[in-house]
Amino acid sequence: MKLLFEGLLVLVLIAFVVAEFESDAEKWEALITQERACKGEGVKGCYYEADDWCCKKTPCKCPAWSHERECRCTQPCNPSCRGKRALMVDPETHRMLSLHRLSEE
């Protein structure tokens, strides 16, 4: 009886992990394909700290489900920002997107 219960518990855990992974994959897909305009588009750049985001006075967009801090530039960085190209998203999301893209290839 105990073995049956443990087996059932393992199956439930596996089902939960698979469902969670599919949910994350949908979020990554939304990040890649669905964008909306940022607040203040074309005024301050992609976030409150325009210099840090290397996007001064250029239009920017955000993933559909995100906050402004995850904006991306729609035009190349200002020439004075060369070598400091803006991260499109926070480092952890950027890492996950890279892994997601590699897994599709």
Curated annotation (Swiss-Prot):
Record carries keyword Repeat: no
GO cellular component, as recorded: extracellular region
Propeptide: 20-36, 86-105
Location within or outside the cell: Secreted
Tissues expressed in: Expressed by the venom gland.
Keywords on record: Amidation, Cleavage on pair of basic residues, Disulfide bond, Ion channel impairing toxin, Knottin, Neurotoxin, Secreted, Signal, Toxin
Disulfide feature: C38-C55, C46-C60, C54-C73, C62-C71
Signal in keyword set: yes
Parts forming coiled coils: none
Molecular function via GO: ion channel regulator activity; toxin activity
Residue numbers of Arginine amide PTMs: R82
Signal peptide: 1-19
Protein function: Toxin active against insects (S.frugiperda larvae). May act on sodium (Nav) or calcium (Cav) channels.
Stated family: Belongs to the neurotoxin 28 (Litx) family.
Domains (record comment): The presence of a 'disulfide through disulfide knot' structurally defines this protein as a knottin.
Protein name: U1-sicaritoxin-Li1b
Native species: Loxosceles intermedia (Brown spider)
Organism classification: Eukaryota, Metazoa, Ecdysozoa, Arthropoda, Chelicerata
